[in-house]
Amino acid sequence: MKRTSKFLSLLLALAMVCSLFVPAMAAEGEEGIVVLYTNDIHCTSDDGLAYAAIASYKAQMEDTYGADNVTLVDNGDAIQGGILGSMSNGSWIIDIMNAVGYDLAIPGNHEFDFKMDTFLDIVENQAEFPYLSCNFVDADGNAVLDPYKIISY
């Protein structure tokens, strides 16, 4: 019994290892989707993975998967932490994010470093993409931003 059990265990382990070598392929006619995201960039504009690199990578993914199948998201803390953010209260970074082609963003705690009015002005008048948040409410408990966005691929 022990010998049979060991043999079956070994056979099962071998089958599991062999399954790692079978490539996963999309069904014919199906396209992949790509969700790219950034977070805690803190105004990075000249390091290795700066906005130019993000724009280039997004373009590569759009060439591969189609522009309608690629979504670029920022998960917060983009507009503060560097000279470009400090000199413009974050607005120059938003200009760069618009040029890169962000599809949506989530505010991080540092999006509020330049005061609430500044952030809301950026959201309402400058960003060409929506900011989303399900837990950002005003004094009366009303949502300030949309809580979600449905994207169809």
Language model regions located:
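Sec-dependent signal peptide cleavage junction
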Residues: 18-30
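Acidic, metal/ion-coordinating pockets
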Residues: 27-153
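Bacterial N-terminal signal peptides
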Residues: 11-19
